[in-house]
């Protein structure tokens, strides 16, 4: 697993051993960031939240492409260790915040985010629950983009969001949402 583009292009990312963490595949990340680039134009200055962060690959990719700051939300100890190691290895500590809390009950945001990534474990209903909790906690800024990765057999119809596009990549389904 590696950073795809930007200042840290080609830099490897550490991942915890075992099956507890399922990092977004490089191909799916490439597709996702292509979709986002066509809509956003640039990542410069954006504030990003990476929920169910795991290794932090999505938030770190956004930072590599110019995002101003990323907040990572994760509870798994092994994933947190890999995430913190990746942030340190890339020299991103000043542009990153790590919150060891549940992404499906994250509480109130200190500030709203322009771009949010959700990559919950497949098949547990966490995407819909997390989207509702994020909305309630004022995590998305007005007009924010939200990326949600699910398995191909999952669909989303979250209240308070509009689905911009859905794309299947391998075993993953990528949903791009906007705040209504």
Residue map of PLM features:
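Class I S-adenosyl-L-methionine-dependent methyltransferase catalytic core
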Residues: 1-180
């Amino acid at each position: 697993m590696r950073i795809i583009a930007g200042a840290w292009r080609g830099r490897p990312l550490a991942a915890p051993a075992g099956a507890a963490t399922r990092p977004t595949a490089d191909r799916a990340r490439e597709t996702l960031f292509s979709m986002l680039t066509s809509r956003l134009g640039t990542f410069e200055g954006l504030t990003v939240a990476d929920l169910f962060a795991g290794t932090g690959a999505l938030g770190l990719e956004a930072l590599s492409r110019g995002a101003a700051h990323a907040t990572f939300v994760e509870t798994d100890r092994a994933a947190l260790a890999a995430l913190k190691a990746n942030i340190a290895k890339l020299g991103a500590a000043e542009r990153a915040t790590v919150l060891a809390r549940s992404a499906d009950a994250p509480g109130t945001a200190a500030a709203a985010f322009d771009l949010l990534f959700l990559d919950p474990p497949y098949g547990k209903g966490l995407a819909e629950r997390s989207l509702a909790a994020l909305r309630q906690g004022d995590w998305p800024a007005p007009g924010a983009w939200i990326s949600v990765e699910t398995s191909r057999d999952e669909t989303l119809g979250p209240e308070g969001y509009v689905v911009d596009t859905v794309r299947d990549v391998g075993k993953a389904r990528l949903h791009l949402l906007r705040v209504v």
